[in-house]
């Protein structure tokens, strides 16, 4: 894979140390569709490999029956291990696309709440957004470079398009 980084943007050992000390709260939205469990498993596996001080995953899903919730809990337990993931079912969504916003109360209560949560970073992912520890290290390094300018690093989401015959930017609609 060919990548271009700004001078000094490659993560340093100091950035790696900072990344390994992280205590991460991660929400993954997953509108329950059984055929998408494999994609969710891939996202969870990438997170399970993070060599960080602490990582907790909250699977935010639509209103599902207990059997489907049990499937999600078993998948999370198998990949993440005991006590590292929970399932949060959201009831009464007017539109299925509203699920993408249901992590906001979790940020308010668990990350920014009135008591010190101990978390240093929050990640929002969806069941088809694989985020590696290398991505996290890049963010840590780029964040420091951009801090004085008041900017934050970003990622461009891409996915494979059969129609285009290649990768396309997921969030570009022109």
Name each model-derived stretch.
Residues 15-26:
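A short, charged/proline- and glycine-enriched loop
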Residues 118-130:
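Short beta-strand-to-loop acidic/aromatic patch adjacent to the donor-nucleotide binding site
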Residues 25-36:
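A conserved hydrophobic helix/loop-capping motif in glycosyltransferases and polysaccharide synthases
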Residues 35-37, 64-72, 163:
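Short, charged/polar "capping" segments at the starts of alpha-helices
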Residues 61-64, 127:
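Acidic ATP/Mg2+-coordinating residue in the GHKL
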Residues 66-120:
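Active-site-proximal specificity loops/subdomain of glycosyltransferases
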Residues 132-174:
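Conserved catalytic core of nucleotide-sugar-dependent glycosyltransferases
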Residues 42-55:
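Short, acidic, metal-binding catalytic loop of nucleotide-sugar glycosyltransferases
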């Amino acid at each position: 894979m060919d990548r271009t980084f700004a001078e000094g943007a490659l993560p340093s050992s100091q950035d790696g140390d900072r990344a390994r000390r992280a205590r991460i709260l991660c929400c993954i939205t997953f509108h329950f569709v059984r055929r998408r469990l494999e994609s969710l498993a891939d996202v969870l596996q990438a997170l399970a490999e993070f060599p960080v001080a602490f990582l907790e995953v909250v699977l935010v899903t639509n209103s599902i029956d207990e059997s489907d919730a049990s499937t999600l809990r078993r998948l999370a337990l198998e990949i993440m291990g005991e006590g590292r993931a929970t399932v949060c079912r959201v009831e009464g969504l007017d539109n299925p696309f509203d699920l993408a916003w249901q992590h906001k109360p979790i940020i308010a209560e668990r990350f920014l709440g009135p008591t010190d949560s101990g978390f240093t970073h929050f990640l929002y992912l969806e069941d088809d957004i694989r985020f590696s520890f290398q991505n996290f290290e890049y963010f840590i390094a780029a964040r420091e470079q951009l801090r004085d300018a008041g900017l934050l690093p970003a990622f461009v989401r891409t996915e494979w398009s059969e129609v285009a015959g290649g990768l396309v930017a997921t969030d570009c609609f022109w």
